[in-house]
């Protein structure tokens, strides 16, 4: 039986934080160890420049994201790990798919519709004011990313289901018009994946400014944890898990029995300050080895580059083969 192919893309527009680790990185690394799965993971740097126009941020983020996944246990021998911009075949496929994609489909993309709505609310006469073609057409590039390797499943959040549905639509259109070359990808939503709460109780997100950095040292992690909001209950007063985001973060780094014990300690009057020390210790214990590996990789980025180039070589071998069939199907052939 052939293996199920799973593809994941990570945009290079920021430095990963604890929420990224719990919600995406840790579960994806574990899933990649499944012997029945063939995993593809890529750094989506071309997607990054759609919204981020700071070259240094794109560059630094590419290094940080790659180092993060490797430090957290991604095995480049088991997972095809590459940088999007190292696979020129993706961009050629992107153009071919652009030529068969209905404009109406792009008009329905959530990001574009949100931009148009914002213009209307701001009184702009031009509904497309400020809309660049990268934002408008990026679902086609995302489709090329997926179809280039005929992924069976694409793990996404609920807000990105539309992207995979569009990829299915475009793949089906190509298959019908030219030749059956593309697998119709399926959405993969893991209901068990945790969305980590931030310092203020909302979803941990850099846009909220409520994150806990992933790669700080033990002392700085403790300082970050100390910022988690709590109520004014004194030491000795019983406390409930829902009275602070601290409990949910602790739960993400603990076994069920440890979580139960922590719940009892809170009920018995554990001081918030002591609870924060226990949480920081949990985080630091789990991340001790990954932090050491991360520092090694970022101190010598050529190690990262070597791994990415090896992944690109592996990916391009397959991409060239499929693109050759796509070119032939649309009539781009050698003259004989």
From Swiss-Prot:
Keyword Flavoprotein: no
Role noted for this protein: Catalyzes the attachment of tryptophan to tRNA(Trp).
Disulfide bond annotation, renumbered to this chain: none
Catalytic activity: tRNA(Trp) + L-tryptophan + ATP = L-tryptophyl-tRNA(Trp) + AMP + diphosphate + H(+)
HAMAP family referenced in this protein's UniProt entry, alphabetically: Trp_tRNA_synth_B
Location in the cell: Cytoplasm
Quaternary organization: Homodimer.
Enzyme class: ligase
Keywords: Aminoacyl-tRNA synthetase, ATP-binding, Cytoplasm, Ligase, Nucleotide-binding, Protein biosynthesis
Provenance organism: Neisseria meningitidis serogroup A / serotype 4A (strain DSM 15465 / Z2491)
Gene Ontology annotations of biological process type: tryptophanyl-tRNA aminoacylation
Motif 'KMSKS' region: chain residues: 203-207
Binding site for L-tryptophan: 145
Protein name per Swiss-Prot or TrEMBL: Tryptophan--tRNA ligase
Residues reported in the UniProt entry to bind ATP: 11-13, 19-20, 157-159, 196, 203-207
Motif annotated as 'HIGH' region, chain positions: 12-20
Pfam families in the record: tRNA-synt_1b
GO cellular component term of the entry, any: cytosol
Lineage of the organism: Bacteria, Pseudomonadati, Pseudomonadota, Betaproteobacteria, Neisseriales
Main localization category: cytoplasm
GO molecular function: ATP binding; tryptophan-tRNA ligase activity
EC code: 6.1.1.2
Family membership noted in the UniProt record: Belongs to the class-I aminoacyl-tRNA synthetase family.
